[in-house]
């Protein structure tokens, strides 16, 4: 395999983003740059200099339509809510013929990708209890995921223990089954029917939930030389999540949060 340098990884991500954007424009699907990608668009008109990924959000109805509509010769949709070997529940659009190797786990993950998070409805009354109930269900996922705690030589031992547990307890739910239960409950709290909305399993906990109307209107901002959709209330959204996001973090914190290497596979 041939390693891909960080700048080329970004070029691939931007090509994936352009592919997603073309599909969404053709199908009338709403989406927005999100999280650090949105900060980058506002503050740098592109990537945050030390960032190395692209995050998007979509209202759940648009997210479901996108999963059905997206077709590409170069890229493929990976809906992680159907996976039994990872804890994530969102979607990645991955470049075919590439692979990312997690340095800590020492194993392949998926191809160079763009992340897409669904935005679901949330009740105003009892929000914290509702959110905590979803989190308790999510806590089951790593327990059922055979490689989640497996690092280095422990991977084989962990996998054997997992298989023996499955044989001894055949009724044990699989990781993807729990994810599907969670998604069914989230879809029941329909986007557009509730006063609040947010990404249940984003990184920012209860701060992820904000007025649903913030996800209804869109504008555009430049990102690496092209215009892309962003929610019109992007300033309110970013201040809710990050506070004064226009202030640069201390220099020691200006580092990537990810620990992987990307490669072209032999069949690329």
Per-segment meaning from a language model:
Residues 21-54, 58, 63, 213, ...:
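Active-site nucleotide-donor binding segment shared across nucleotidyl transfer reactions
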């Amino acid at each position: 395999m041939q390693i891909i340098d960080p700048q080329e990884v970004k070029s691939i991500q931007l090509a994936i983003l352009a592919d997603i954007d073309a599909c969404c424009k053709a199908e009338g699907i709403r989406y927005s740059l999100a999280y650090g990608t949105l900060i980058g668009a506002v503050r740098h008109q592109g990537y945050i200099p030390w960032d190395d990924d692209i995050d998007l959000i979509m209202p759940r109805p648009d997210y479901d339509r996108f999963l059905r509509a997206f077709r590409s010769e170069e890229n493929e949709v990976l809906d992680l809510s159907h996976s039994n070997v990872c804890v994530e529940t969102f979607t990645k659009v991955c470049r075919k013929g590439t692979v990312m190797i997690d340095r800590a786990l020492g194993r392949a993950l998926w191809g160079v990708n763009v992340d897409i998070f669904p935005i679901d409805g949330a009740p105003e009354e009892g929000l914290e209890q509702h959110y905590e109930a979803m989190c308790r269900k999510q806590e089951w996922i790593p327990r059922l995921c055979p490689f989640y705690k497996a690092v280095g030589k422990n991977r084989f031992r962990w996998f054997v223990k997992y298989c023996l547990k499955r044989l001894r307890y055949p009724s044990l739910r699989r990781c993807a089954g729990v994810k599907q239960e969670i998604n069914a409950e989230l879809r029941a709290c329909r986007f557009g029917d509730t006063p609040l909305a947010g990404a249940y399993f984003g990184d920012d906990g209860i701060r992820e939930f904000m007025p649903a109307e913030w996800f209804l209107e869109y504008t555009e901002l430049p990102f690496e030389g092209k215009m892309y959709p962003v929610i019109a209330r992007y300033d309110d959204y970013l201040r809710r999540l990050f506070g004064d996001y226009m202030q640069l973090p201390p220099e020691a914190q200006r580092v990537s949060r990810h620990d992987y290497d990307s490669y072209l596979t032999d069949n690329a």
